[in-house]
Amino acid sequence: MTDTIAALVRTVLLVALAALAASAVVAAAEKPGSVTVYVGTYTDGASRGIYRFTFDPATGATTEPVLAVQTKNPSFLALHPTGRFLYAVGEVDRFEGAKTGMVSAFAIDPKTGNLTLLNQKPSEGTGPCHLVVDRTGGNVLVANYGGGTVAVLPIEADGRLKAASSVRAHEGTGPNKSRQEKPHAHGIYLDAAERFAFSPDLGADRVFVYRFDAAKGTLEPHGAAPLAPGSGPRHGAFHPTGKYFYAINELLSTVTAFSYDAEKGALASLQTVTTLPAGFSGTSSTAEVAVSPDGRFVYGSNRGDDSLAVFRVDAATGRLAAAGRVGVGGRTPRHFAIDPTGRFILAAHQDSGTIAVLRLDSKTGMPALVGSPVKVDKAVCLLPAPAR
C-alpha cells in the first residue's frame, strides 16, 4: 500500500511539474515586450518552411520553435511596415512552369504569430535570395541570384502581391571563374529617403544603383559602385545616419565602407578591411553584415571560420577599425540579426541547424554567447517582429 501511495505521489508531482513548465513557456511567449522571431530555412532536409519562436529582449530567453507555415526554401524574409504581412523568397529555379523563383505573401495571425499564404508571384529570375519592403508598404523589391536580376512587385491593400512592375538585369563578370561567370544579384537595399535602391552583385563586383519610384513601382539605372576584382559583394547595410554604406564581400572575406551622397545617390569607397584574423589559412566566406542601432559598431559573419567580426565605426569618417572576433557557437552563420533593443545578436547556423543568442557589451560592442541554442534545421534567415 505504501509503495502504491508513493507511486501515486510521484505521478502527481510529475504532472504538476510538467504543467508548470508548460505554463512557463506560455508566459514567456506572452510576456509584454517579447519579440516573435521568424526563421527562414532550406527545406531539402528536416525543415518544412518558416518557423517562429519568442525572444525576450530583456533577458535573451527563447521558447521552442514551431512551424509557422509550410513553404519551399523560404531563404529570406521581410516584414510589412504594418506588421500584418510577411514576405518570403522561394529559392527555386522553376515556378508555374517558368524558369524563375517565387515570392510569397503571408498574413500574420496577431494572436498566434502563425502565417497564412495569401498568394505567390514570380520573382522574375532564378534563385531569389533577398528582398525588402518599402516603408509605404506598397512594394517588395527582390534580388535574384541565379538570374542576375532585381525586380519590384507591387503590394495590394490586402497584402497580396501583384505581378512585377519593373525588372532590371545586371551585367558583368569577375575573375573568379567558378563564382563570377555571370551576374549574381545578392541583395537589395533602400536608402533612408527611399529615392535610391542598391544591389550588391557577387558576380559583377559592383553595387548597382537604381532610382526608385515607390508610386510607380519602378527602378531606373543610376550607375554602379565598383569593388576590387574578385571581391564578390553579397549583402550591405546603411549606417543609421544614412551617411555610410557597408558591403560585405563573400569571396575575399572583406567589408568595404562607402560614403554616401544622398542627394546624388552616389557611393564612394573609403576603405576595405578583412573579416578574418591575421594569418588565417583555412577556407572561409562572409555572409551577413549589420550596423548596431547606435551606429558605433559594424558586424560581419564568417562561414568556415564560424565567427563574427566586430568593427568600431569612426563617427566622423565612417571608417572601420577592427575590435575583435567571436565564435558564434555553430557552423556556417549564414545570417544574423540584431534585436530591436540593440542588446543581443541572434545568429542562424545553416550547417549545425541552430540559432545562437549573443549578448552585446554596451561599451565594447563585443558579443558573448548566452543560454542554449534554438534548434531549427538549415536555419538561414532571422526576422525579429516586435509585437504591435
Question: What are the roles of these predicted feature ranges?
Answer:
Residues 30-55:
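An edge-strand/N-cap motif at the start of beta-rich repeat modules
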Residues 54-60, 106-113, 153-162, 211-218, ...:
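Short loop/turn segments immediately following beta-strands, especially the blade-tip
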Residues 63-69, 117-121, 174-178, 220-226, ...:
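A short beta-strand motif characteristic of beta-propeller blades
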Residues 11-24:
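Bacterial N-terminal signal peptides
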Residues 64-133:
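Blade-loop segments of beta-propeller domains
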Residues 32, 46, 71-82, 124-139, ...:
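Beta-rich, blade/repeat-based domains predominating
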Residues 43-46, 92-96, 146-149, 204-205, ...:
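Short glycine/acidic-enriched loop and turn motifs that connect beta-strands
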